[in-house]
């Protein structure tokens, strides 16, 4: 105001007072306004303070509530923190445990992988070993079959050798006895000729007075040859053994007759022996007293000496027999005749002048004819025994008697419940050709028929299964051993549990074993005709059969060589062989490899190739006998 007052200049003091009064009035108005404003402000501030107190009390209450809530939440937080820490520790422990277990499982997986790898390697090695064992088994089976056949051949040869040794010893004994009998008979013939000569001279001297009767007696007496002629005509023991009569029947025919007689004596067991029609020559009595029939080309029971009553009995008693009783009767009759002849010669010496010429001449002729016939029979037997090894050739039919077939096909029960048994009760006999080939002799030995027989599986199974054939991993020896997929509509393998305890000799067909009989007989004859009893030829032929099919399929040897085969059985199995067809082993192995490729490495059991498939409705059952028992093989 001072500044305003200093700046203000009044004209008069009244104006100055007036001015200052107006100023005071303005200031008082401003004061009143300010006081009213203050009063309003105080009132508003009181209201505001009340409201603020209310708000403060509410805020304090809220704060207390929030604090209490905060404390509660803090406690919950601590609880959750402890729970979290505890869960975290548990999680860490669990994680550690799981990590340890994971490490262990990884180690176990690695170990199992290594074991699986080792197992697979071992499995591969075992399968390789199994294939090697299968091939070795097939090889050993082939060797076993070959050994069986060789053993059968050796047994047959040993039996034949034993029989021939016995025959040789018997013939030696008979030769010695017959030599002694020939010596006795020769002395007897010499004495009888001297006695008959003395009787003839005495009768001619006595009958000189009656010329017609003396001529008749002289004609009826035997002609007296000179000493040189008698020495020429009288056969010595060496001539009887080495110089047979020229008009004798061929030795092959006599050997055939001997074999036929032996077979008749063995099979028929008849007491009647065949005659000596093809062996003995015509005697002087037979040519002078009877019209003897001519000899036929075949052996018959009629002999030229049977025309007279005397030789009818001699033809059967002195025949060429092989039974011991007949030989003993022959020797007894010869000794009895020798004793009777000696007694007659001794007793007729003092009475030679009293005997009539006709009776003495006829008796001496009969005695000489009988002795000559006996000597000729003995000579023929000795010559036949000496020429036995020379006549029997490798290509000839054997004249040696063989044992009859004792085989019987005994099989397992058939479809109708009965056993299929084939016994050779009425075995047909094929005619056996003689050695000289101009006639046939009915034989009692069963001859194998010439029909085509089923081939064996030895030529197919001789090659062992090698890895080059594509043998599957799951292939087993049973599928190699008994697979016959091409033999019928379905395969018929051998079960697995029967493989190791199964006889390999019985796996082959029965007819194939029969087929080995003919081959074994042929090889036996070949080995007999060679150097002694060697069987190198048969072993070579068996090796050929093992290595390849050089022999025809009808003569392929099998596991077991049967001794003999009847013709009816061979015809039956030959008819069965035409109903089955065979395929090589390599083809069957290739097909089995293709079929069993899906079963490689299977762990659920054996592959499908091991399992026996359903057999077709129409099957042919053929029984076979083995060393382990009877089994049935189906086609």
From Swiss-Prot:
Residue segments, region Disordered: 35-63, 200-267, 279-328, 389-504, 516-635
Pfam families per UniProt: NUDE_C
Subcellular localization, as worded in the UniProt entry: Cytoplasm, Cytoskeleton
Subunit and interaction comment: Self-associates. Interacts with PAC1.
Protein source organism: Mycosarcoma maydis (Corn smut fungus)
GO molecular function: microtubule binding
GO cellular component: cytoplasm; kinesin complex; kinetochore; microtubule
Keyword Coiled coil applies: yes
Protein's GO biological process: centrosome localization; chromosome segregation; establishment of chromosome localization; establishment of mitotic spindle orientation; microtubule nucleation; vesicle transport along microtubule
Highest taxon listed in the record's lineage: Eukaryota
Compositionally biased spans, kind Low complexity: 280-299, 516-541, 620-635
Family: Belongs to the nudE family.
Compositional bias ranges of the Polar residues kind: 201-224, 237-246, 314-326, 411-428, 547-571, 580-619
The keyword Cell wall biogenesis/degradation belongs to this UniProt entry's keyword annotation: no
Gene name of the record: NDE1
Keywords: Coiled coil, Cytoplasm, Cytoskeleton, Microtubule, Transport
Biased composition (Basic and acidic residues): 43-56
Name used for this protein in its record: Nuclear distribution protein nudE homolog 1
Sections of the chain in a coiled coil: 14-192
Role of this protein: Required for nuclear migration.
């Amino acid at each position: 105001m001072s500044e305003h007052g200093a700046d203000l200049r009044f004209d008069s003091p009244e104006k100055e007072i007036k001015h200052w009064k107006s100023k005071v009035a303005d200031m008082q108005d401003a004061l009143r306004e300010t006081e009213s404003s203050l009063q309003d402000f105080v009132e508003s501030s009181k209201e505001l303070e009340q409201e603020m107190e209310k708000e403060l009390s509410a805020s304090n209450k809220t704060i207390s509530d929030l604090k209490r809530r905060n404390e509660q939440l803090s406690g919950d937080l601590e609880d959750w923190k402890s729970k979290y820490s505890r869960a975290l520790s548990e999680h860490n422990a669990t994680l550690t445990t799981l990590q340890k277990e994971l490490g262990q499982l990884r180690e176990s997986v690695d170990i199992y992988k290594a074991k699986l790898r080792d197992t697979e390697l071992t499995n591969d090695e075992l399968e390789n070993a199994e294939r090697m064992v299968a091939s070795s088994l097939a090889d050993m089976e082939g060797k076993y079959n070959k050994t069986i056949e060789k053993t059968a051949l050796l047994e047959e040869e040993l039996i034949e050798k034993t029989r021939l040794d016995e025959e040789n010893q018997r013939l030696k004994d008979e030769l010695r006895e017959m030599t002694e009998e020939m010596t006795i008979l020769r002395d007897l013939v010499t004495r009888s000729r001297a006695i008959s000569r003395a009787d003839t001279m005495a009768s001619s001297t006595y009958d000189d007075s009656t010329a017609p009767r003396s001529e008749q007696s002289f004609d009826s007496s035997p002609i007296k040859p000179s000493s040189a002629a008698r020495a020429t005509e009288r056969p010595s023991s060496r001539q009887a053994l080495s110089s047979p009569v020229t008009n004798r029947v061929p030795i092959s025919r006599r050997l055939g007759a001997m074999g036929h007689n032996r077979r008749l004596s063995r099979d028929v067991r008849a007491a009647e022996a065949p005659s000596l029609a093809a062996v003995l020559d015509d005697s002087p009595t037979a040519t002078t007293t009877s019209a003897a029939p001519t000899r036929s080309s075949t052996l018959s029971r009629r002999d030229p000496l049977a025309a007279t009553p005397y030789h009818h009995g001699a033809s059967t008693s002195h025949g060429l027999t092989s039974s011991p009783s007949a030989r003993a009767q022959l020797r007894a009759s010869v000794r009895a005749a020798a004793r009777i002849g000696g007694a007659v010669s001794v007793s007729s010496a003092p009475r030679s002048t009293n005997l009539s010429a006709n009776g003495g001449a006829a008796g001496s002729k009969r005695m000489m004819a009988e002795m000559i016939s006996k000597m000729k029979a003995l000579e023929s037997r000795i010559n036949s025994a000496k020429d036995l090894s020379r006549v029997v050739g490798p290509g000839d039919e054997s004249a040696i008697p063989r044992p009859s077939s004792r085989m019987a096909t005994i099989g397992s029960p058939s479809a109708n419940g009965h056993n299929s048994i084939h016994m050779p009760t009425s075995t047909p006999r094929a005619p056996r050709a003689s050695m000289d080939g101009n006639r046939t002799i009915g034989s009692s030995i069963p001859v194998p028929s010439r029909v085509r027989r089923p081939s064996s599986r030895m030529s197919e199974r001789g090659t062992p299964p090698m890895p080059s054939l594509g043998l599957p991993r799951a292939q087993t020896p049973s599928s190699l051993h008994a697979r016959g997929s091409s033999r019928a509509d379905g395969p018929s393998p051998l079960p697995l549990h029967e493989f190791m305890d199964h006889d390999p000799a019985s796996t082959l067909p029965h007819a194939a074993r029969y087929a080995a009989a003919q081959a074994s007989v042929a090889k036996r004859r070949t080995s007999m005709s060679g150097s002694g009893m060697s069987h190198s030829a048969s072993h070579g032929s068996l090796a050929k059969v093992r290595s390849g099919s050089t022999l025809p399929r009808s003569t392929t040897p099998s596991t077991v060589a049967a001794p003999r085969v009847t013709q009816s059985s061979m015809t039956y199995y030959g008819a069965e062989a035409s109903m089955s067809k065979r395929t090589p082993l390599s083809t069957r192995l290739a097909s089995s490899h293709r079929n069993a490729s899906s079963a490689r490495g299977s762990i659920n059991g054996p592959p499908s190739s091991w399992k026996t498939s359903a057999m077709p409705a129409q099957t042919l059952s053929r029984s076979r006998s083995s060393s382990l028992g009877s089994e049935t093989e189906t086609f």
